[in-house]
Curated annotation (Swiss-Prot):
Residues 355-384 are annotated as: Disordered. This is SH2 domain-containing protein A. Expressed in roots, leaves, stems and flowers. Residues 547-641 form the SH2 domain.
Amino acid sequence: MAGDCAIDTEKYSLLEDFNVDVEVENKAFETFSLCFWVYLLDSTTYPSAIIRQVHSDMSVSAPFLVLDENKKMMLLPLTLLHREAPDPVNTSSWTEVPNVSTTAKFPLQKWVHVGCEVSRNYMRLYICGELVGEQVLTSLMTNGTNSDCARKISLFSVGGDGYSVQGFIHSAEVLPSNLSASYHYTKDPPLWLSVDKPSTSGIELDEDGVWSVVSGTFCSLDVVLTNAIGQPVHKDVKVVASLLYADSGTHVEKRSDFEAFLLVSYEGIELSAEDKPCNLLNGCASFKFKLSQLSSKSDKRLFCIKFEIPEVKANYPFLETVTNQIRCISRNRDSVSSMKRIRLGEEKVSESKIVNGNGTSMEWRPQNHEEDNSSTDSENTEMRDSTAFRRYSIPDWIIFKYCLGNLTERALLLKEITNNSSDEEVSEFADQVSLYSGCSHHGYQIKMARKLIAEGTNAWNLISRNYRHVHWDNVVIEIEEHFMRIAKCSSRSLTHQDFDLLRRICGCYEYITQENFETMWCWLFPVASAVSRGLINGMWRSASPKWIEGFVTKEEAERSLQNQVPGTFILRFPTSRSWPHPDAGSVVVTYVGHDLVIHHRLLTINHICDSSERYTDAKQLQDMLLAEPELSRLGRIIRGI
């Protein structure tokens, strides 16, 4: 098992499997120290024996280390060494004999280091390397005892009876007299997975200790892998999240034809949490998650999120962790005020426009890296000046539901609308959403929905041939053919780096599923559609200069612009914008400002020219870009080897 995982699980064993023999010589014996890390599960009966003792003259074992009725740990004398040793049968004698006890309750479901130092005339108890007590005892060894006889005592744990606890033990060792318990405490601490304090954004802590989150809103928290003394552990492992009911601990099962209830964001792409493990980096995995389509009020239940390491196959509770109970609040409670905000269009984004002689305009504004939880992502207010509403077959509440929904909710709604509505009705729906939201780019995404879904379904059927999992190498050819056809550009193929980025967006490795493909397609199709139109098509075709160097991440662009002169810029398609986000398929300008800081601005081209103008318009867009005072020189992508 340990060979398949970066975590050596063979170091951890059940407490009931613990067994160690200690030889006690009559004259030469001085002292021994038994040290170990223990993780105790809850027990139903107290007092309970953690470790018991037995030797050849005993027919029944006696307790050595116990939890008393108050859950305090007690170290008891050895029957082979001390006159004060407890009666093996009479449990009441455990508290009557001299012992060493902790002053506080022993913590359960947590790693604790225990050290038991035993000599002829005393015993000491250490907790986490610190001495908590000492007891003077009377030795059974006398000078008249046969010095050639070495006695052995067995220390062990059992499970299943009424006087034992269940748990795990790590690094149990009998130390020689020259080594201390504090030495063992820092030698090889066990590992511990836990949830760090959540960020204040998106999570509220109620008075009852329950987290309150709004359904459909992204929240952030960190999961950390440390050792038991709090030091971060650098292991090449992944952590996966799953949603549970807080009362029963059972998984919240996905309903048929619905998206997963627990989603995570990876480079702006929403994925099912159970399908997208997160890498630990320097002992920490940062999760950006949201709960979708859930309400604690309607479901009458609280939830929690469980994090675990999938490579660890056995059930080790210390290598998994659960959040506080979560109260999921439906977004519908704010629907009235949200609809009013959308109608009034109170949220505006500052922008500057460049207009050329042909009436083509280009919006130039900061790129918003937040998730799409607002109704207006790209502002274009000319739709507000339209005439009164036309007679419309799709009801207003569907329009409001779309405007208020997140990306996943909008995608599901568009699939339903395109299946049950004509092209004219879909077009009218797009116009109405644009009018209510004040954002015409919503209309672009709605009008491409039918073609995006149909093309994507056809592409997957050709790729999969009814197989659930398809090797990535068999996918790339079909993806490239579809992209070049939709983009109306047969002269430029996708590169190896382009496919690497597409695979990252998919969230897959060697094999791709339909869910992986659909995630990628929702990003690729709007990009291909944008490339097919005049202004972008000419720039995509251009080889010298190469205005768009393929599919580029934000990090690659920033790295390429390090140490470049102000005004140097790179054009890229943002990986955080997927259909039906209103800015899907847009272009981002990443550039070095006069302040020597790298900036990102979203370039939204209105009234995009027909594809027949694709060759003549590249120069026009070039002039529009270079006319900006912040832009003066096209940069190049520098990728690591």
